[in-house]
């Protein structure tokens, strides 16, 4: 849509519609390929953020040609077909079929046995039991925010979920927890109360979502934050035997 409103052009990114100044937009020929895009290798679909960075987001869609780039403003609607994301819009107030032993094995598979979260499968399952928050989601969220328990904030503050780690002052403002277990259990409680069971701000749905709905609206500024966590859940589910889907 090339129509302008007061010199601004409507755009859509990660499901959110907004406006930018027309002088900040460059028109691209519809026959030109560019990145970011979505591409299938015949088994999985990847969202390529750049030439060097991509995440696995879905199973191959039969409407897609292998290796051909596809484009979408929300990652779901592709004109003639829709892409099914296994975990991005799934209910996080649910129980994972993975056991504590499965979760511990995942850290080994990911080469993260030297991180602070290794061996904490029982604590993730305890958080799931106590607060009703999906354990696989908690593992994936903490993996993204803390680099599988190896970030400096994780090491120094037992903060594995980016709580209060604001963009301008991530380290200094990040909440500190007494130990690893309280970092997991405390975060699960906080996330549930604020984003999952809550019906007011900042909650926008008990799922990861994108910038239009779900946790991604207010939990993180990054437009593909929800997709990135869902991708980790998807990859983990593949590695551990597809018990959750």
Predicted features by range, described:
Residues 4, 8-15, 21-137, 148-245:
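Catalytic cores of secreted/periplasmic lytic hydrolases that degrade extracellular macromolecules
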Residues 145:
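Pyridoxal 5′-phosphate
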């Amino acid at each position: 849509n090339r129509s302008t409103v007061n010199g601004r052009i409507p755009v859509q990114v990660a499901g959110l519609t907004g406006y930018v100044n027309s002088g900040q937009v460059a028109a691209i020929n519809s026959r030109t390929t560019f990145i970011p895009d979505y591409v299938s290798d015949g088994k999985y679909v990847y969202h390529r953020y750049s030439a060097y960075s991509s995440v696995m987001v879905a199973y191959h869609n039969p409407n897609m040609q292998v290796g051909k780039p596809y484009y979408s403003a929300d990652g779901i609607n592709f004109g003639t077909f829709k892409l099914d994301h296994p975990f991005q819009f799934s209910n996080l107030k649910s129980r994972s079929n993975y056991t504590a032993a499965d979760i511990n094995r995942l850290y080994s598979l990911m080469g993260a046995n030297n991180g602070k979260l290794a061996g904490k499968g029982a604590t993730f399952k305890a958080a799931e039991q106590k607060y009703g928050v999906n354990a696989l989601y908690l593992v994936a969220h903490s993996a993204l925010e803390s680099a599988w328990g190896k970030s400096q904030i994780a090491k120094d503050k037992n903060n594995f979920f980016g709580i209060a780690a604001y963009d301008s002052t991530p380290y200094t403002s990040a909440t500190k927890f007494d130990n690893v277990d309280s970092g997991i259990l405390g975060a699960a409680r906080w996330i549930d109360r604020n984003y999952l069971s809550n019906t007011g701000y900042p909650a926008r749905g008990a799922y990861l979502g994108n910038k239009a709905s779900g946790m991604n609206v207010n939990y993180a500024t990054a437009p593909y934050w929800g997709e990135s966590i869902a991708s980790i859940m998807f990859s983990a589910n593949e590695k551990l035997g597809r018990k959750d889907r």
